[in-house]
């Protein structure tokens, strides 16, 4: 019970920071299938800047290990709570997030992998705090069937990468094999299978 109370207080402290518009819980904890090894995946949506200097003292009260402002995938703080549970906090610009959703879902644009990950994250997250209801409004706006044009564009883009164009994965695998570069063969084969 204390773990839930402490973590709730952490969300409250983050929510009190200027510029924080919304906070959401994602991953296995939001989906209801967390186990004893599950971490917390938390998304903090901001308008403006929430600096590392502002975040660090808040997190220090709850965490015994912190890596502040990592940028491996997104802007994030990777921490270990004092109870031993890992915590990943991702900081996202709410306006940029909205633009990205529109670009994918409404405009049907595809990327190389991860095209719909933000949309899925929005639709499966549990909102913990929503200052003006903007995140909930986005959830409602984007709770739509999978757009046919998006499906078409993802398939078309990925089919080209599988073969038939100069930088396609099959050509990259062939070239790596000819060079005896088995690390590249493995890497490109994984990308091929991902597509």
Regions flagged by a language model, labelled:
Residues 64-177:
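Conserved NTP/Mg2+-binding pocket subregion across the NTase superfamily
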Residues 4, 8, 115-116, 124, ...:
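Residue-identity detector for threonine
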Residues 188-195:
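Small-residue-rich helix-loop
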Residues 10, 171-172, 188:
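Short, hydrophobic/aromatic alpha-helical segments in well-folded domains
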Residues 1-21, 31-37, 44-112:
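Metal-dependent nucleotidyltransferase catalytic core
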């Amino acid at each position: 019970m204390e773990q839930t109370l402490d973590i709730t207080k952490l969300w409250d402290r983050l929510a009190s920071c200027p510029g924080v518009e919304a906070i959401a819980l994602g991953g296995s904890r939001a989906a209801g299938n967390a186990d004893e090894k599950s971490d917390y995946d938390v998304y903090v949506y901001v308008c403006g800047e929430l600096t590392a200097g502002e975040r660090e003292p808040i997190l220090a009260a709850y965490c015994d290990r912190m890596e502040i402002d990592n940028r491996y995938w997104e802007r994030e703080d990777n921490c270990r709570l004092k109870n031993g549970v890992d915590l990943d906090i991702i900081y996202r610009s709410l306006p940029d997030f909205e633009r990205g959703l529109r670009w994918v879902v409404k405009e049907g644009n595809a990327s190389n992998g991860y095209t719909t990950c933000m949309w899925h994250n929005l639709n499966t997250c549990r909102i913990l705090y929503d200052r003006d209801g903007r995140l909930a409004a986005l959830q409602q706006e984007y709770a739509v069937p999978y757009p046919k044009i998006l499906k078409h564009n993802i398939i078309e883009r990925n089919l080209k990468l599988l073969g038939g164009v100069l930088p396609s994965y099959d050509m990259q695998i062939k070239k790596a094999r000819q060079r005896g570069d088995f690390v590249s063969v493995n890497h490109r084969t994984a990308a091929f299978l991902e597509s």
